[in-house]
Amino acid sequence: MDNRFVLMTEYFNSSHTGRKKEIIKSIEVNCRIPETKRVVIFMDCDTELPSSLSDVLSEENYKKIEVNRFPIQRRSTYSDFFSYANQHLAGENCILCNNDISFGGDLDEIRLAKNFELNQHFICLTRC
């Protein structure tokens, strides 16, 4: 059984160059780590994935990216993510996170935590 994680996040075209680079770097890092099976990116119909992602990722890691489109001029809601997970990712280990969160070995700590069963749980990571 493949118990790696499916990460879900949102991508939007930030007008701030530094912020845009930070978001792209997080997506890149999350695609490279072995603990992720897929990275589902929610973005509107008018937004394109930055070409820099395909330039820096291997073909195998780039294929982890799955784009889910939604109507223009609308940000994704928690309901959008939960509905998508229920319809398309039943039985998967899913994590919803802000688009600027990058993971390393932390995902193994979640998956291997004692006295914590991932089954029937949905993990959402954000910051205050």
Task: List PLM regions with ranges.
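Short, acidic, metal-binding catalytic loop of nucleotide-sugar glycosyltransferases
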Residues: 20-37
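Short beta-strand-to-loop element that shapes/binds the nucleotide-sugar donor at the catalytic cleft/hinge
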Residues: 120-128
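Active-site-proximal specificity loops/subdomain of glycosyltransferases
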Residues: 42-94, 105
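N-proximal low-complexity "stem/linker" segments adjacent to membrane-targeting elements
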Residues: 1-24
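Short acidic, S/G/P-rich loop/turn micro-motifs used as interaction or catalytic elements
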Residues: 12-17, 47-48, 100-104
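Hydrophobic targeting segments
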Residues: 3-9, 30, 38-41
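Acidic donor-binding/catalytic loop of UDP-sugar-dependent glycosyltransferases
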Residues: 96-114, 124
